[in-house]
């Protein structure tokens, strides 16, 4: 059984719930989703393992229904970087992200998040790619952000998360982080709690967004498995359980984390 909090995703303490998923849910489902969520993930290019992007051209309908945005560009996996000029690919992909953001109508100053799918400490080629992308966005009319894991993993005699690795490189330079940490705890599972849920609980103090539940449920979330549906996915309230309606859950101190309205 899923436990949900009604009404627009806003709870006390000025935090807001949002959703993301790889496939666009369909125009008909957008109003129902806004009853629970204030913002949506918005892909600028093909999402992971997809050959097309159903989000293209959907900014207007989402905005008309009151949604803010988390603007996302699908980055490259390590296998796509090994043996190549990773920094050059980062700059080229940043240029593609900038062009796509302009085409979709996102104004200057919006945050573009790079989707860094693989967790742990960045390998040299991953680091070269990611930071070249970040610097190219930083030099444009947009602001850089990264979607990455906040889950600690073994790193020699210590532990590391992708988020901490990135922050140690960036120092005090501004970089928005959308942190994925669905481990229970700190994540509550597939619920929208009545109590304020702080992005800092992701394990990254200055996280702009915390993704705290994913579909399908991962082993990290086994302690809160009962909060997910029987098929191990997470669904929005008031929607049927279907391939069009499972999603990931996020919380932020902003109702428009990317400033995309």
Kindly label every feature range from the protein language model.
Residues 4-6:
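N-terminal signal peptide c-region/cleavage motif recognized by signal peptidases
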Residues 10-23, 30, 163, 167-261:
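Functionally critical loop-and-helix segments that line ligand-binding/catalytic clefts
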Residues 11-140:
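Substrate-binding cleft of extracellular glycoside hydrolase catalytic domains
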Residues 49, 78, 153, 216-218:
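Flexible, glycine-rich phosphate/dinucleotide-binding loops
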Residues 74, 148-152, 214:
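Acidic carboxylate-rich catalytic motifs and surrounding loops in phosphoryl-/glycosyl-chemistry enzymes
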Residues 124-126, 155-166:
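Distinct, well-ordered alpha-helical segments
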Residues 140-157, 209:
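Aromatic-lined carbohydrate-recognition surfaces of secreted/lumenal glycan-active proteins
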